[in-house]
A protein has these predicted regions:
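Secreted peptidase-domain scaffold signal
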Residues: 237-332, 338, 400-410
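Cellulosome-associated attachment modules in secreted, modular CAZymes
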Residues: 405-464
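C-terminal edge strands of extracellular/lumenal beta-sandwich accessory domains
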Residues: 210, 214-215, 297-299, 335-341, ...
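Short glycine/serine- and small hydrophobic-enriched flexible loop segments
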Residues: 41-45, 186-198, 220, 305, ...
Length: 464
C-alpha cells in the first residue's frame, strides 16, 4: 500500500467487514489508511463485501518498505527476501516511479525474479494518469490490472524499459478504480488458489501450484466484449495472424471467476512432442510443461459442434539475471491447426475461411510473455494447439497453457442418429444428406455448408 504523508498504510481492523482478520504490519507500526481499507474489503471482506472472505491472514507492507528493505531489497546487493509464511500472492494497488530508468528497471527485475524464484503471483494496478507509471505493472511476470470501463492508461511499455513494447494491462475488472479492480482480481486469484488445494482434479498436483499455471488459468477465463480485438490480419495469405496477443485497452478481457474455475478444475492434460496418436483434451483445462530452444508441443481438441468462442492462453516467465540489470528472454508462440486425418494443417490465409469466423489462429509477439488465441465460430472438427519456442536463451523454460471451449453435449461426437455409437448407420445419414446444406444439417460435421467426403473422413475419426 502506498502510505500517506503520515506514513499510514494499514487497513482498519475495526471495520465491520474486516473483523476477525489478522493483519501483520511488515513495514512498521501504522495508523489507518482508508484506501487500504477499501481495497481490502473488496478482496477479503465479510458480509458479502469481498470476493474471498475466507482469507484471514494478511501481511501488509508500505510500498516503500516492500520495494526496499522489507521484501524486494532495492538498494542492496541482496536478492529479495523469502516471503513470510505461505504467501501465494501480492496485491499492489499502487503505482510509483523513482524517476530514473535504471532504478525502475532494477525494481521491476527484482519483482520478476521474486515471482519466478518464490513462486508467487503479483497483481499490479496500472495508473489512470495521462502517461504510464512503471512500478509495478511493467513487470514481465506479473499480472497488470486495469478497469473494465477503460479509464486506465493502456497500450505498450515505452522505450527505456526492458519491457518496451509489451502490452499493459493484461486483464481488467469491473470496478471504478484500478486499485479496486486489482483487489478484485487478487480476490479471484485467491479463490482459485483455494479451489486448487481442494478440488480432486488439482489437489496434490505439483504443477497446479506453479504461478505460471495460476496466471494462465486466470487469463484464459477473461470475458471478451464485442469490441475486443487483438488486431488479427483479416484477409489474404496471413489471415488469422497477430503479433499483438491481447486487446490494447482491455487485455484478455474482464476477469471471470466462473470461466477460470472451469479451466482450473478441468485439470491438467499433458501435451506431446509428437502429433501422432494424440488423445482429445477436455473442453476446459490446462497444461504446465517445459520448452527448449526450437521445440514444439501439441494438444488435440475434438469440437463436436460449432464453437461460438474459444480462448487459449500461453504464458511463461522471463528470468532476471544476477545483478538485476538484464534478462534471459524466451520467445514462445502459439498456433491452432486443423487436424485432418491425423496430420496438422495450417489455418492461416484462405485455409481458415469457413473454419473459423473471426479471430486469430496464430499469436506471435516478440516481447509479451502472453500469447493468446481468441476465435469465434470455430467449426466442428479436430484441431491441435501448437506451442513453440524460437529464441537463443539457454535451458528449458516452464510455460503454462490454458484453454476454454464451449461445454459440449453429452452426446457422442459423430453419433448422427443418436444411438450412442458411431457406425454404418451414421454413415447412411451422411449419404442421405449429401450435397449443399439447407436449414439444419447435422450430417455436415465439418460445418462448411456441404455434406461431402470431408464429413465422411471426420465421421471415420469418431468411429466406435
Amino acid at each position: 500500500e502506498a502510505a500517506n504523508e503520515s506514513d499510514n498504510y494499514a487497513p482498519d481492523a475495526n471495520n465491520s467487514a474486516l473483523i476477525g482478520k489478522t493483519f501483520t504490519l511488515r513495514s512498521g507500526s501504522s495508523g489507518v489508511l482508508n484506501h487500504a481499507t477499501q481495497v481490502g474489503k473488496r478482496m477479503y471482506g465479510t458480509d458479502g463485501v469481498g470476493l474471498a472472505p475466507g482469507v484471514t491472514d494478511i501481511n501488509v507492507y508500505s510500498a516503500v518498505g516492500w520495494t526496499q528493505s522489507n521484501y524486494l531489497r532495492f538498494g542492496t546487493g541482496s536478492n529479495p527476501s523469502t516471503p513470510p509464511g505461505n504467501i501465494e500472492l501480492f496485491n499492489n494497488s499502487w503505482v510509483a516511479s523513482f524517476g530514473n530508468f535504471g532504478y525502475d528497471n532494477e525494481v521491476l527485475a527484482r519483482g520478476d525474479w521474486a515471482i519466478d524464484a518464490h513462486n508467487v503471483m503479483m497483481l499490479n494496478g496500472v495508473t489512470t494518469a495521462d502517461e504510464h507509471v512503471p512500478l509495478m505493472c511493467f513487470g514481465f511476470n506479473c499480472v497488470s490490472v486495469g478497469a473494465s470501463d477503460g479509464t486506465h492508461t493502456s497500450g505498450t511499455v515505452p522505450t527505456g524499459y526492458h519491457q518496451a513494447g509489451m502490452q499493459v494491462p493484461l486483464i481488467v475488472a469491473a470496478q471504478g478504480t484500478t486499485s479496486n479492480a486489482t483487489g478484485v482480481v487478487s480476490a479471484i486469484t485467491a479463490l482459485l488458489v483455494e479451489t486448487r488445494e481442494t478440488h480432486p482434479n488439482t489437489s496434490g498436483n505439483f504443477f497446479a501450484g506453479f504461478s505460471e499455471t495460476m496466471k494462465a488459468v486466470l487469463l484464459t477465463g477473461g470475458n471478451h466484449s464485442n469490441s475486443w480485438t487483438n488486431n488479427p490480419i483479416l484477409s489474404g495469405p496471413n489471415r488469422g495472424r497477430t503479433n499483438q496477443p491481447i486487446d490494447a485497452i482491455y487485455g484478455v478481457g474482464t476477469a471471470n471467476i466462473d470461466n477460470s474455475h472451469r479451466v482450473l478444475t478441468g485439470g491438467q492434460f499433458a501435451s506431446d512432442t509428437s502429433t501422432v496418436g494424440l488423445g482429445s483434451a477436455p473442453t476446459a483445462g490446462w497444461d504446465t510443461t517445459t520448452l527448449t530452444n526450437g521445440q514444439s508441443k501439441y494438444i488435440k481438441f475434438s469440437v463436436a459442434s460449432l464453437a461460438d468462442e474459444v480462448s487459449i492462453v500461453l504464458t511463461w516467465h522471463q528470468q532476471a539475471n544476477t545483478g538485476f540489470g538484464s534478462y534471459s528472454l524466451a520467445d514462445l508462440n502459439l498456433e491452432l491447426l486443423h487436424y485432418n486425418g491425423g496430420k496438422p494443417t495450417s489455418l492461416t490465409g484462405d485455409a481458415g475461411i469457413g473454419v473459423f469466423g473471426s479471430g486469430n489462429c496464430i499469436s506471435e509477439s516478440e516481447i509479451d510473455t502472453v500469447e493468446h488465441l481468441y476465435l469465434k465460430n470455430l467449426s466442428a472438427g479436430e484441431y491441435v494447439v501448437k506451442m513453440s519456442r524460437s529464441d537463443s536463451a539457454a535451458g528449458a523454460r516452464v510455460c503454462s497453457l490454458g484453454w476454454l471451449f464451449p461445454e459440449q453435449d453429452a452426446s457422442v461426437p459423430g453419433d448422427l442418429n443418436g444411438d450412442g455409437t458411431v457406425d454404418v448407420n451414421d454413415l447412411l445419414v451422411i449419404i442421405a444428406g449429401w450435397g449443399v446444406c439447407s436449414g439444419e444439417c447435422p450430417a455436415d460435421l465439418s460445418g462448411d455448408g456441404l455434406v461431402d467426403v470431408s464429413d465422411i473422413l471426420l465421421l471415420l475419426s469418431y468411429w466406435s
